Amino acid sequence: MISHFLNFLKFNGTPGEYGSPLWATVYILVIFGVASVAVMLMTYLERKVLAHMQIRLGPMRVGPHGLLQPIADALKLLIKEDIVPDGADKFLFWMAPVTVMMTAFTTYLVIPFGRSHAVTDMNIGVLFMIGISSLGVLAVVMAGWSSNSKYALMGGLRSAAQMVSYEVAMGLAIVSVLMMTSLQTGTGTLSMIGIVQAQQAQGSWFIFKFFPTGLVAFVIFAIAMVAETNRAPFDLPEAESELTAGFHTEYSGFRWSLFFLGEYVAMIAVSSIAVTLWLGGWLRPFPNALSGATWDFAFSVFPALLFFVLAAGCFIGWVRMPSKPAFKVQAIGLGIFGVLLGMIGAVLLIPAVRVRVSDIFWFSAKVGVFMYLYIWYRGTFPRYRFDQLMKIGWKVLLPVSLGVLIVTAVLGVRHELIAGLMGVAR
């Protein structure tokens, strides 16, 4: 078993390429666990960031600075009564939240967190991702229909109309990326890992390719992905001021928590897709401009140094904390947290760990920026009316995405012609 584990660590590929169902299963379980913990952390950060935007403190009661509030919320949801309304289609009512959660998690099968940190390198990864992510709206419509409530049904129908409006523009933006992958090889790729490798080979993230064409395509996808996940300011399917709670009005307890978990997991998933397609995926900043062993080492030890800085901050806070009985528990918790961060930083300095974790760190840092943008949007922009949302999708994003696709094709042909002429001249 140990030799099998060591052989897998030496293998520079995905578990699917290694041909081991065991390691593929382990990866799936790890992704499920990490994504669930990330959702808990995301809910805490969202409440804190929104509180600071509104000059409040946010959760402060449960744990130091409210750090244990997500755990308290999860336990509360698990022990709440689970009510099924009279007249509801019980089978569909039960299946809808499970389907929402499963479609969100299934997307992670093709998302590469690093060259060897993906469940599988599927050669139709982009097509698989688009198809699976589109299934979530069917579960939302299922929830609205099966609840036997006019508010829930309206929310489900809104979600379906919203998905149709924004999925087209999102798909065209993705097609422009697929066209960019074929510039040097002559044949594009639908592999998510292949798209990141194409950005590395061309020496540029696709957000900067054919500037500003790549940037416009990225902005279209960024807007569409907010609408795709039903987040503010495009949260019309669950508009509290109009539809009580939209498609999950009649849900409570554990089943409501599955909708909640699916929404946040989908947010992380679409952010990961945007990072993979336009921001170089797991590639560190400036991989071509700042190349060489020295720069590779400097960027690979950065995660460990960051954990050491965070640990130092915890110890400084521990020293400065008032020596009163009321602060004793917080002081102990802060000190233990600082020790854990320091231990993680020390482990990240081990060469074998440092090389593998560096990819995950840079990927996660980019995704974290998108998570902050989600919170920023919610605290800043008012909710659109439904007719305004439809108008943006059909009259703005769709024509612009078509224009971006045409311009990308023209510039790509021009690039290939110039490259061909230069090759003939040589």
UniProtKB/Swiss-Prot annotation:
Q: Does the keyword Translocase apply?
A: yes
- GO CC terms in record: plasma membrane
Instruction: Extract the InterPro entries matched here.
Output: NADH_UbQ_OxRdtase_su1/FPO, NADH_UbQ_OxRdtase_su1_CS
Q: Which top-rank group of organisms is this from?
A: Bacteria
Q: What is its EC number?
A: 7.1.1.-
**Which EC class heads this enzyme's classification?**
translocase
PROSITE patterns assigned to the protein according to its UniProt record, in alphabetical order = COMPLEX1_ND1_1, COMPLEX1_ND1_2
What membrane topology does this protein have? Multi-pass membrane protein
Where in or outside the cell is it found? Cell inner membrane
Q: How is the subunit organization of this protein annotated in UniProt?
A: NDH-1 is composed of 14 different subunits. Subunits NuoA, H, J, K, L, M, N constitute the membrane sector of the complex.
Q: What does this protein do?
A: NDH-1 shuttles electrons from NADH, via FMN and iron-sulfur (Fe-S) centers, to quinones in the respiratory chain. The immediate electron acceptor for the enzyme in this species is believed to be ubiquinone. Couples the redox reaction to proton translocation (for every two electrons transferred, four hydrogen ions are translocated across the cytoplasmic membrane), and thus conserves the redox energy in a proton gradient. This subunit may bind ubiquinone.
State the name under which the record lists this protein: NADH-quinone oxidoreductase subunit H 1
Q: Which organism is it from?
A: Koribacter versatilis (strain Ellin345)
